[in-house]
Amino acid sequence: MDNIETILRLAEEKILLVQSLKVLQEYKVEFLGKNGIVTNELKKLGSLSEQDRKEFGLKINKLKEEIQNIIKAKEEILEEEELNLKLSSDKIDLSLPARRYKQGSIHPITQCMEELIQVFAKFGFSIEDGPNIENDFHNFTALNFEDDHPARQMHDTFYLKGQENDKPMLLRTHTSTVQIRAMKNGKPPFRFIAPGRTYRSDSDMTHTPMFHQIEGLVIDKDINMGHLKYVITEFIRCFFENSNIELRFRPSFFPFTEPSAEVDIRMSKTDKWLEVLGCGMVHPNVLKNVGIDNSQYQGFAFGLGVERFAMLKYNIKDLRQFFEGDMRWLKHYSFSSFDIPNLAGGLTK
């Protein structure tokens, strides 16, 4: 009995003075471990009578429980002290200089694309999208390209391995493919633009193998060339934010439109004419290829290069600079991520 009380007092004295969890663990082993003080006391049970063994066993179990409670209580105190110490050492020093915040910026192509979309939204155009990898039908045949058209040649188009419905696979050369898919899957009227990446085997100051296009389509009853001229004229003046800009429509040829035209602009009478886009009335064969009755519906289409419009508006001289990743160039020509294009506040800040 006296020995049990002595062990309990010894445990209380040692544990209450502990200042670290490591030392507390050592005392736990000392008293309750495999070769600990309490465990050694249990070994005395074998030398006692049955009655004394029962009484002594109860006392040892009670001793063990009390020591465990003392250790647990001390452990909670030490853990709280350790946490408070850590929190106090982790305080933010407000006198330290702040880290420089590096904010990203908007690439001029992205900015130009957003501005163009904003302008077309003014005329009620929605947005359609489609795959970059296409088959020959959507890219050429449905758009009235002849089998021997130069655009079908390997030196102009990136062909891929494999076929779809016995048609060669390729990287789309224009976003007109989106127009074909939309007309096949829907019913007129249509009024949408198709922005996206396009691919052609060409590279110089004014051409890159990958470039961005926006192509537009309007299909409805009683659509004529006057509607096309109005939309293009108002779009150009709105995008360049210049109501005095001059436009001229030159006769041209595209397989998918008839009649066809190319649009030139100049900012003032002293400037040279600059070609900016192609357009025309949708060819009846194109409507026939997508199952639209060309005796009831007509329409117009247009296509423009986003890089071309960005170069003209932001005064960029070389198309290849858009994709070279020169941080100095990007810093000069990029836009703030807070300057979201809108017609009310002005497209470009």
Swiss-Prot record:
Biological source species: Rickettsia bellii (strain OSU 85-389)
Entry's Gene Ontology BP terms: phenylalanyl-tRNA aminoacylation
Similarity annotation: Belongs to the class-II aminoacyl-tRNA synthetase family. Phe-tRNA synthetase alpha subunit type 1 subfamily.
Major site of localization recorded for this protein: cytoplasm
Binding site for Mg(2+): 258
Coiled coil feature spans: none
Gene Ontology cellular-component terms listed: cytoplasm
Cofactor comment: Binds 2 magnesium ions per tetramer.
Binding partners and assembly: Tetramer of two alpha and two beta subunits.
EC number: 6.1.1.20
Entry cofactors: Mg(2+)
HAMAP family associated with the record: Phe_tRNA_synth_alpha1
Superkingdom of origin organism: Bacteria
Gene Ontology terms, MF aspect: ATP binding; magnesium ion binding; phenylalanine-tRNA ligase activity; tRNA binding
Pfam family, one: Phe_tRNA-synt_N
Gene3D superfamilies according to UniProt: Bira Bifunctional Protein, Domain 2
Protein's cellular compartments: Cytoplasm
Reactions accelerated catalytically: tRNA(Phe) + L-phenylalanine + ATP = L-phenylalanyl-tRNA(Phe) + AMP + diphosphate + H(+)
Gene behind the chain: pheS
Keywords, in A-Z order: Aminoacyl-tRNA synthetase, ATP-binding, Cytoplasm, Ligase, Magnesium, Metal-binding, Nucleotide-binding, Protein biosynthesis
Name the UniProt record assigns to this protein: Phenylalanine--tRNA ligase alpha subunit
PROSITE patterns: AA_TRNA_LIGASE_II
PANTHER family xref list: PHENYLALANINE--TRNA LIGASE, MITOCHONDRIAL, PHENYLALANYL-TRNA SYNTHETASE
SUPFAM superfamilies: Class II aaRS and biotin synthetases, tRNA-binding arm
